[in-house]
From Swiss-Prot:
The gene is rpsQ. SUPFAM superfamilies: Nucleic acid-binding proteins. GO terms for molecular function: rRNA binding; structural constituent of ribosome. Belongs to the universal ribosomal protein uS17 family. PROSITE patterns: RIBOSOMAL_S17. This is Small ribosomal subunit protein uS17. Keywords: Ribonucleoprotein, Ribosomal protein, RNA-binding, rRNA-binding.
């Protein structure tokens, strides 16, 4: 891989979240939570957003903690790709 391609790949945004749905084919829904400080009151509030991410091999299951990376649009709602598994889901 050339140096320019390497830096372009590293400039993509990455987020870490939890898989909340794996019912679609080659797609997982990832819930990303982040803490933001309220502008007036100063209290930290938990904000969350769901992203559809591409899972080529259908290998990620519900409850897995994954890292997703921004990519080209693959469908109307899907422009993120799962890059790696951070932590597997614990089976109780």
């Amino acid at each position: 891989m050339t140096e320019a391609a390497q830096t372009e790949k590293s400039l993509r945004r990455t987020l870490v979240g939890r898989v909340v749905s794996d019912k679609m084919d080659k797609t997982v829904t990832v819930l990303v939570e982040n803490r933001v400080k309220h502008p007036l009151y100063g209290k930290y509030v938990l904000r969350s957003k769901k992203y559809h991410a591409h899972d080529e091999a259908n290998q990620y299951k519900e409850g897995d903690k994954v890292e997703i990376q921004e990519g080209r649009p693959l469908s109307r709602t899907k422009s993120w790709v799962v890059s790696r598994l951070v932590e597997a889901a614990r089976v109780i």
